[in-house]
């Protein structure tokens, strides 16, 4: 491929509008990147400089090739890139960025490389200083290089498996200790120059603006560096401290550093000023131990004064970016400093007043930067939470200002509703996660001056509830007015819920108890009013708020610490609810009401069932619930007549709720069921009736198109799975199984699977039901030697897998629908077989003994299903990967002979998948693969021992035909096992070896199986070392096998693990040379000439 053709392809890739042309160009360029002549052609593309896109391709290709280059080539490319950036003018910004990224990666990759006794890649800072002395454009490029270098050094993404995480940390630590502080001080000096010459700088000039922007980014990158390798996620904004090294102390003790960024904020235009606040956010978060007490006070004083000055003038806060970063700065003030320290600041009274005023105004301006409110509420939440621990004699003044904040929050939410309805704006109530987060913050803030909060809530609630009730009684009332009041009441119900749950975190008084009672009563009265309207109309958002409130009441009453005397007294006076059991009855009536009238709303049904589930999961509440009349009603009337969401008119997504419903009913039923079979079968009567009506229908030849029958099957599968989940006792579980098996209901499910195997909406619930039925949860299937239940259940589950597998194998599925249409079902089949065989309730030997082909059939179909899965899909779909490796783990532990009996193609597939698993980043997958491999190779070793055995009674030790065939397959694919040995041994030699115990066990067996190959690997590793270290390395390898016998006993493996631990310690401590760190590379024979680039034609 010539240079002109490459330039055309680049143009097509980035400019063509035809997708086909772009796709073909992309394929051709991917081929070029891996070609042997990529390196010299990249140089030619850069030298010609005819196309910016070609320059981009050259720079990005060189970046990908870094690890395949020799030290000399990397040095040459480094020199060329620096020279190119310095001498070629008017480069496009994306080309500059690509070259800057190349330089940063080269520097990181070669940080410890020595050339002619010089650490050549550690000189980049000195080279960049030459750029800083040039024009504005050169200075900008120099700053970009430093900024990208800091980002690259801070990156935890592994460049390659050969660059371990620990090596990257060593590089980052070395860079931090040698150059990061100098880089930070250099960026600060550039900012000082910009500030001092601000009158002579035109910030509207694009080049000047770009330079200042990059310098500020560089400064922030320095302050955001992962100094101690904690890998904190700055995007999460979880208030982590910045672990500034002690060597940086002078920079932070100098008050001019803080002043610099406050000054820049005042000087810089919008678009740049926010970067200076971002830097202040990081500076505010420096670790407390960097200062002593007096230094910290002085630092905090300057910080609070700077914040106060901004709040006084509100300069720049009309810009959303500035506003957002300033809110983050306010939140960090409290995250890193104690309230007592803030109170000690001389200007604290004035500052807290301004912060309160700013918060109130921000809450009322709810349309402006709504995501920033979180930081303001965080500040107030943290300050209020600290009040009990303050020992300062000075007043904290929070009692004065928090009521203002709460009032602003409540009134701003209420005032927003008419505007949202009138102008059809996005409703914040639709963002449930954000609402919940704010309510959690409010629950703390509200408890400061709680009587004021309660009085305000009562005042607003009474007014809105009265107006709402009047509207409902007014004929032909405006529906918009009704909606507005319903949404306003929704906010008030949410806020009241947050207020009463806040009592769980503080010591409450009788007065507070009475206030909570008043709030609870009002919401319950509103609930009674809205329930009376339900046959005609209802507000979904208000119902969700009431459910959230009831959940808070549940938490309050389930807490042993909460005082409830006054609350119960008021509930008794108003509603006649004299004790907790009557309150639970009241809540359950609401649950039944919702299930009856809100069947059309998936969100309300789901939240209602979640509330029922929470009530049924705790022993204390179950004990009280089980006796309630309302609960007995649910246990005897769970039909679509009383609960419409159980009918066939529900959508498929709504039917998912049914599992949760029956899990809750199952818990309530099991509480005092004991061995009462009659009561259990009475409970099952609605399900029995459905099965009986399906029995004859399912045999009809026209059933395939019967949508109602299909929905009944889906509903039954979900119901039964929900019911099976809480049946942990063997007696109750046996009742369920016998009902299913002896009433011939399982064949109906098998028939449904046969009919609708192509439809995941049917197959997934049925497969999940069987996965639960075969799960030996709390040994519910084990222990009864007189019962054939385990065998019978396994046979039915095997039939299901065989029916599904045979149908799905012949079904064509498009790639984009592969997971939902096929792979998800296959994963559940793996889970069913794993649960069956791993439950230890099926004696698999009896099948062969009595000529039953159940086990062979299911293993054969599983083998066929395995072969339909592409290896890449095992990595791409985590649930499939987990189910697959868990099944293999189960089979290899107790049923390895069945793995050996698989057809050769399936066994080879398994070996290849283990190879993939050993390269996986997920530790669970890696450990699982090591365990599976250990079982398989140990079995191979024992079979080979048996083959050459001289045991007197040869008949006991002879190989059957299956094992002879198995050993032939192993022999033909020995390179797979050898490659895994190589992978495991390579892992041992890495600095951050994972799961040493797990991987040492299969490694020993592989060494015993393939001694010659191990010897060749060992020799190659030893020869790769410098001559003076080879003898030492050889001795360490000899010591690795000291005391190791030729067997695969646990004792022998333990000894090898101990030896390997010593071996690893010695190898990791051996100083590495650059010669030893190399890999094969598909590169050209010629080097990269560091010649002068041609001048750019443009």
Swiss-Prot record:
From the UniProt record, which GO molecular function terms apply?
Answer: nuclear export signal receptor activity; small GTPase binding
Tagged with keyword Mitochondrion? no
Give the GO biological process terms.
protein export from nucleus
For this protein, the record's InterPro entries field holds:
ARM-like, ARM-type_fold, Importin-beta_N, XPO4/7-like
Q: Tell me, what does this protein do in biology?
A: May function as a nuclear transport receptor.
Q: Which domain of life is it from?
A: Eukaryota
One Pfam family from the UniProt entry? Answer: IBN_N
- Where is this chain's protein located in or outside the cell? Cytoplasm; Nucleus
Origin species:
Drosophila melanogaster
User: SUPFAM superfamilies, from UniProt?
Assistant: ARM repeat (SSF48371)
Q: Which family does it belong to?
A: Belongs to the exportin family.
Q: What is its main location?
A: cytoplasm
Q: What is this protein called?
A: Ran-binding protein 16
Going by the UniProt record, its keywords in alphabetical order are: Cytoplasm, Nucleus, Protein transport, Transport
Question: Subunit composition?
Answer: Binds to nucleoporins and the GTP-bound form of Ran.
Q: Name one GO cellular component term.
A: cytoplasm
């Amino acid at each position: 491929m010539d240079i002109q053709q490459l330039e055309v392809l680049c143009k097509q890739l980035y400019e063509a509008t035809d997708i086909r042309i772009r796709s073909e160009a992309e394929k051709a360029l991917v081929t070029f990147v891996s070609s042997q002549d990529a390196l010299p052609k990249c140089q030619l593309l850069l030298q010609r400089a005819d196309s910016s896109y070609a320059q981009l391709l050259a720079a990005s290709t060189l970046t990908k090739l870094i690890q395949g280059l020799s030290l000399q080539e990397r040095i040459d490319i480094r020199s060329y890139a620096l020279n190119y950036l310095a001498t070629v003018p008017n480069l496009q910004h994306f080309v500059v960025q690509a070259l800057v990224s190349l330089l940063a990666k080269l520097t990181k990759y070669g940080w410890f490389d020595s050339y002619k006794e010089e650490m050549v890649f550690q000189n980049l800072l000195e080279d960049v200083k030459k750029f800083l002395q040039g024009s504005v454009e050169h200075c900008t490029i120099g700053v970009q290089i430093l900024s990208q270098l800091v980002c690259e050094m801070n990156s935890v993404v592994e460049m390659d498996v050969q660059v371990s995480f620990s090596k990257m940390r060593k590089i980052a630590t070395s860079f931090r200790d040698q150059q990061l502080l100098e880089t930070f001080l250099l960026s600060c000096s550039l900012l000082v120059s910009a500030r001092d010459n601000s009158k002579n700088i035109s910030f509207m000039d694009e080049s000047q603006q770009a330079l200042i922007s990059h310098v500020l980014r560089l400064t922030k990158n320095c302050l955001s560096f992962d100094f101690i390798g904690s890998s904190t996620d700055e995007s999460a904004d979880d208030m982590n401290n910045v672990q500034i090294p002690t060597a940086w102390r002078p920079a932070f003790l100098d008050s001019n550093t803080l002043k610099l960024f406050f000054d820049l904020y005042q000087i810089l235009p919008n678009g740049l000023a926010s970067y200076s606040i971002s830097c202040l956010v990081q500076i505010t978060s420096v670790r407390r131990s960097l200062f002593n007490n007096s230094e910290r006070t002085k630092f905090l004083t300057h910080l609070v004064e700077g914040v106060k000055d901004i709040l006084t003038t509100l300069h720049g806060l009309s810009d959303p970016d500035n506003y957002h970063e300033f809110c983050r700065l306010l939140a960090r003030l409290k995250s890193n400093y104690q309230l007592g320290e803030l109170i000690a600041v001389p200007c604290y009274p004035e500052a807290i007043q301004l912060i309160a005023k700013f918060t109130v105004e921000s809450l009322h301006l709810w349309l402006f930067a709504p995501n920033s409110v979180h930081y303001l509420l965080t500040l107030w939440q943290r300050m209020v939470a600290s009040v009990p621990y303050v020992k300062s004699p000075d007043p904290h003044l929070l009692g004065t200002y928090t009521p203002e904040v709460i009032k602003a929050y409540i009134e701003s939410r209420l005032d927003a509703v008419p505007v949202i309805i009138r102008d059809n704006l996005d409703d914040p109530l639709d963002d449930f996660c954000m609402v919940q987060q704010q309510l959690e913050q409010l629950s703390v803030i509200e408890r400061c001056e709680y009587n004021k909060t309660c009085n305000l809530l009562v005042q607003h609630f009474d007014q809105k509830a009265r107006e709402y009730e009047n509207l409902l009684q007014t004929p032909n009332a405006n529906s918009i007015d009704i909606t507005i009041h319903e949404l306003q009441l929704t906010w008030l119900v949410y806020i009241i819920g947050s207020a009463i749950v806040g009592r769980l975190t503080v010591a409450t008084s009788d007065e507070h108890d009475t206030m909570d009672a008043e709030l609870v009563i009002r919401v319950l009265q509103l609930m009674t009013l809205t329930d009376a309207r339900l046959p005609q109309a209802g507000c979904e958002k208000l119902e969700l708020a009431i459910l959230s409130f009831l959940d808070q009441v549940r938490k309050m009453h389930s807490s042993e610490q909460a005082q409830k005397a006054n609350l119960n007294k008021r509930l008794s006076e108003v509603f006649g609810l004299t004790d907790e059991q009557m309150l639970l009855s009241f809540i359950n009536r609401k649950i039944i009401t919702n299930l009856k009238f809100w069947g059309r709303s998936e969100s309300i049904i789901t939240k209602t069932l979640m509330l029922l589930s929470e009530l049924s999961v705790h022993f204390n509440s179950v004990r009280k619930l089980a006796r309630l009349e309302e609960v007995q009603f649910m246990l005897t009337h769970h039909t679509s007549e009383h609960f419409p969401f159980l009918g066939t008119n529900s959508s498929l997504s709504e039917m998912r709720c049914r599992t949760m419903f029956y899990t809750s009913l199952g818990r309530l039923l099991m509480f005092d069921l004991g061995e009462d079979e009659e009561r259990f079968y009475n409970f099952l009567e609605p399900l029995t009736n459905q099965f009986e009506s399906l029995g004859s229908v399912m045999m009809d030849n026209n059933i395939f198109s019967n949508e109602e029958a299909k929905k009944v099957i889906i509903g039954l599968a979900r119901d039964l799975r929900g019911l099976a989940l809480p049946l942990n006792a063997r007696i109750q579980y046996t009742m369920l199984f016998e009902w299913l098996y002896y009433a011939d209901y399982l064949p109906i499910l098998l028939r449904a699977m046969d009919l609708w195997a192509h439809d995941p909406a049917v197959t997934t619930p049925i497969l999940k039901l069987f996965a639960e039925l075969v799960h030996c949860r709390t040994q519910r299937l084990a222990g009864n030697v007189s019962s054939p239940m385990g065998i019978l259940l396994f046979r039915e589950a095997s039939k299901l897998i065989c029916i599904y597998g045979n149908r799905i194998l012949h079904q064509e599925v498009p790639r984009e629908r592969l997971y939902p249409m096929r792979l998800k079902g296959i994963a559940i089949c793996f889970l069913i077989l794993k649960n069956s065989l791993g439950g230890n309730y099926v004696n698999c030997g009896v099948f062969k003994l009595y000529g039953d082909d159940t086990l062979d059939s299911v293993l054969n179909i599983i083998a066929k299903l395995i072969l339909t899965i592409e290896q890449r899909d095992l990595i791409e779909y985590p649930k499939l990967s987990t189910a697959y490796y868990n099944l293999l783990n189960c089979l290899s532990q107790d049923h390895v002979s069945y793995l050996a009996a698989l057809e050769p193609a399936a066994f080879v597939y398994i070996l290849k998948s283990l190879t993939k698993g050993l390269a996986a980043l997920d530790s669970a997958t890696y450990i699982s693969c090591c365990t599976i491999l250990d079982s398989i190779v140990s079995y191979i070793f024992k079979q080979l021992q048996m083959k050459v055995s001289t045991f007197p009674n040869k008949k006991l030790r002879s190989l059957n035909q299956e094992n002879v065939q198995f050993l032939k397959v192993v022999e033909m694919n020995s390179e797979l096992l050898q490659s895994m040995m190589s992978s495991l041994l390579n892992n041992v030699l890495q600095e951050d070896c994972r799961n040493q115990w797990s991987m040492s066990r299969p490694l020993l067996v592989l060494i015993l199986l393939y001694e010659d190959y191990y010897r060749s690997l060992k020799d190659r590793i030893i020869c790769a070392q410098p001559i003076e270290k080879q003898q030492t390395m050889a001795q360490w390898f000899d010591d690795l096998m000291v005391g190791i016998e030729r067997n695969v006993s646990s004792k022998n493996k333990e000894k090898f693990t101990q030896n390997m631990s010593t071996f690893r310690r010695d190898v990791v401590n051996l100083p590495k040379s650059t010669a030893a760190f190399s890999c094969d590379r598909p590169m050209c024979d010629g080097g990269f000439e560091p010649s002068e680039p041609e001048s750019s034609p443009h």
